[in-house]
Amino acid sequence: MEKKIILLILFLFFISGYSMNPPTPIDAIYDDKSFTLIFNSNLPYSTRLILYKNEKEPRTEMAPNYFNCSLVDGERHCLFHSDEPFSRLWGSIDSKVCVRDKSNTVEDCTFDASGLVYYPKVYNLKYSKKPKTSGEDIVITGSYLRLFGGPNFLINSIDVNKPFVVKGNFSDPSFDCNNITVTFPPGSGKFRLYYDETGDNPVPFSYESPIISSSVSDSSKQIITINGDNFFTDKDLVKVSFDGIDQPNFIISVNHKQIQVNNYNRVDPGPMSVNITVDEVSIEKNYIHCFPAIITSISSVSNHLDGIVTIKGEKLSSTLNSSLTPSITIGDKVCKFIKSTTTELECKLDANELGGKNLPVNVNFGGCDSTSPNGVSFTYNIPTLSSGSYSNGIVTLIGTNLGTNNESSIQLYGDGIKNTNISQFNVSSSDEKSVTFELPHLRCRSFNINFTRSGITAKTLSISASLSVNVINRPTVSNGILNIEIYYMDCTISSSAPSITVGDSSSASPCSIPSSNSSYYETTCPTPYGTGINKQFIFKLNSETVSDQFSYAPPEVENRTISDDGTNIELHGNNFGNSTSLIKVYLNGSDISSEIQELEDHQLTIKILDSYENGPINITVDGNYMDSLFYLTLPPVIYRITNKDNKTLACGGLITVSGKNLLTSDKEFKVNVKSNNKNTTVFAQDEKILIVRDESRESSLFVTTFIGVRSGPSTTLTYIKPMISEIPTIENKIEKGILAIIRGYSFTDILNASLTVSSETVPLSCNLECSLSPNEILDDSDSSETNITNSNTDCLSCHSGSSVKNTSGVLYLLFNSTSFQYNVTIEEIKLSPSPNVSQRDVETKSSKPSNGLIIGSTIGSVGGALAIGALAYYFKIPFRVKKFIGKKF
């Protein structure tokens, strides 16, 4: 289709006789994301590109493109747009550009793109590296790399008829033309690359410079071998120079990789500069080849004195440059140069406190290190040991050149003794002739000493130590056993059972026959009844004796019990002793030793005082402290039942008990409150107050308290007299009967209720709901409050099975001995066709009682608050309800 359009346009041109000039941009502006061609405003301008794959075949897969032209300052700026990314801009030198004249809408697409003077050249060009002379693939990145060039060949100045191969399928829509891989064949030197094939825009490039990785000289064969890369294969293109002097006698012994220079000999030590140039491309930095000094022997000096070191060998002096003097190092120390010939050198070595063995020696001429064919190294004087002794746990060694703590090491070994390293010892600093160290525990008496300084071991020395013991436990106060480790035994003879004498005892107690392990012998010895710390004893084994000390085990408490009457604490444990004068007992830091009632080694009885609080118990026996304190929890104490005037509400009444430790978790001390020998319900509780709810309806309550099975305070509570706060209108439901809801406080379910109308008395049956919900308590002093409502009153629901015809009557109520009588209004209620009637929750018309209001005596604590709350509600006095939060009942 596109070809037909082009032919049609050409045909129109020929018919009209119109001839269009080729596009001649005066400039091009471009970067990696856009390009603009600039034309004179009165001349033809470009409209689009037709990129070709080759000389004759356009790119059919190419997305549409166009130039968006506009006049800017009298010039026509044509910005190129394409529906595919710029990384896909590629085409041959035969690509076409379409042109339009300013005065004609006809588009002419016959012009060669190569005819454009200005167009985007390669931009932001980068190479992954330069190619080796042996040839390799190189990655080239940049913009417009294949615009008007290639695409799969890159023309070069080495041979324009043999372009480099560009890898990749350019017709693949995913192929990135800004990132191409080019195969460079083997070659050398500098050349030019032509990315657009016009020949007008050469880009200089070259093969990689020669690289020298190593060099080896063979003086016997007078050959120097140079290893590296990029030496190419043609000797005529290569130049080799040593210290600026060309070397004609060389061959390329391995293509690209190795050059061998023949007939070269040098007697002086030091560096030599090597330069290689391949096809006018030189090595980037001259390589330094070293002719090393050769060391065959070296003398030794004392490490703590200055000394002259003599080195023998070859190339130890420069005959060509007398000012070239070496730097000499022995280990990490400098040996100051004195003089030298080609075969012998002298230098001065300062004192070296660390010394050393087999230290490396280096004679460096101008940066070139020496070599030694027989591995010559330097060693300071060898240490010697002449004698050794043991006294009071300290070993002393006598010798020479013993070095310092940092460079020396000591190891002990022997029959029956595992190898033991001594990490802490002291060498005399003035003459290095003595060493002292603390002898560690050894199983056997005789041992060998291995002394090493800087890796040099002195002659082995043998020493014997005297008997020693180590106590490893603390015996109990009674029937105690002392475990003793034995060191420095005579392992060559059979030992009899040792004995122990404690304190001022006149008799010794036999111990067990020592048993052995890899580190020591062990025996067990009995100890007499006793307490305290640092007790002296004498240990005897065969003919040797040694003195030491031990401490008895500290007191410990395992558990506690409380006496049946609750008056005493019994602490059970160990090592309490039997003397009250030697024991101290502290509770919460206070001394309670005076309250000790009984004392035995395993039990301690203490009287309980009201002032005691839960806390840590600390016991000392004869100056011996407990390892860990015992936390003492005390049983609950009930002080009294605190209801004021021994009163409580009749309906769901609360009973308040005061005391301490009321929250104990011990089942044996659980606090329980009973009313008329019946269990009560816990309403609220903390360490000092317990509030329970009584569920009975009896007129008086005999309240008893218990701590576990032990009884506590008891009393008899009576109910405050009932009080009515609200009498609603009586509902008279036809066919259902009479319903009356009465609200108040301290109602009982022992009552008689009736409604008198005219001369007829209608008996009423009543149901009672107590007011106090199980998560509320009345209070008048808390900031977290809500107003009291009818939900906080007792609710009495009374009804009959028959209705009445009257509109008024007298309601009679009798609670035990307290009676109430009210004139009431009776309201007839008609039932709906589909009734769903239950206990009414909505307030009906109500009336406040005008007479018969009776209030019993108020009670203390919560009971009193309830009575006060009832009064407050009746007289509309502000009152609050406090919520219990976080309590578990």
Swiss-Prot record:
Entry keyword set: Cell junction, Cell membrane, Glycoprotein, Membrane, Repeat, Signal, Transmembrane, Transmembrane helix
TM helices/strands, residue ranges: 852-872
Topological domain ranges for the Extracellular compartment: 20-851
One GO cellular component term noted in the UniProt record for this chain: cell surface
Listed GO MF terms: identical protein binding; receptor ligand activity
Cytoplasmic side: 873-889
Protein name: Tiger protein C1
Organism for this UniProt entry: Dictyostelium discoideum
UniProt gene name: tgrC1
